[in-house]
């Protein structure tokens, strides 16, 4: 199984630690943005082409995953559109933290709504058996 972690850029160290835990469970992380993140996100200094390349790489990483793990309480911005994209395209979404109104509505009324959990530990416990299959 492949999994993409959605979180605020500033939480890249936490995401890298989650990547290690995923690998130990036999789950391949695809969120390469976190492996490369260093310091604060500085989009203002990027050209339009650079922004597009980053966005395109992240989208391809997300599209290659069968599960997206959303760290909703990390004050992310782009992550909400990534989560919506995952739900639209049939990627299973595991939502850690407080859900948004839209995520809750998708969970109740949508065919591919997120699975809500309180902590990363809860998410990994639920996903653990799936990685070895």
Q: At which residue positions do the language-model features occur?
A:
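Conserved catalytic or regulatory cores that recognize and/or transform ribose-phosphate-containing ligands
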Residues: 1-133
């Amino acid at each position: 199984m492949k999994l993409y972690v959605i979180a605020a850029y500033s939480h890249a160290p936490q995401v890298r630690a989650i990547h290690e835990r995923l690998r130990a469970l036999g789950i391949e992380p695809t969120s390469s943005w976190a492996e490369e993140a260093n310091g604060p996100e500085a989009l203002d200094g990027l050209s339009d082409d650079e922004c597009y390349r980053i966005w395109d790489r992240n989208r391809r990483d997300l599209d290659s995953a069968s599960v997206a793990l959303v760290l909703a309480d990390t004050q992310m911005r782009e992550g909400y559109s990534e989560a919506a994209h995952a739900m639209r395209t049939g990627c299973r979404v595991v939502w850690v933290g407080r859900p948004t109104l839209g995520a809750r509505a998708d969970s109740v009324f949508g065919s591919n709504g997120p699975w809500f959990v309180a902590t990363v530990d809860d998410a990994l416990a639920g996903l653990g058996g799936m990685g070895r299959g």
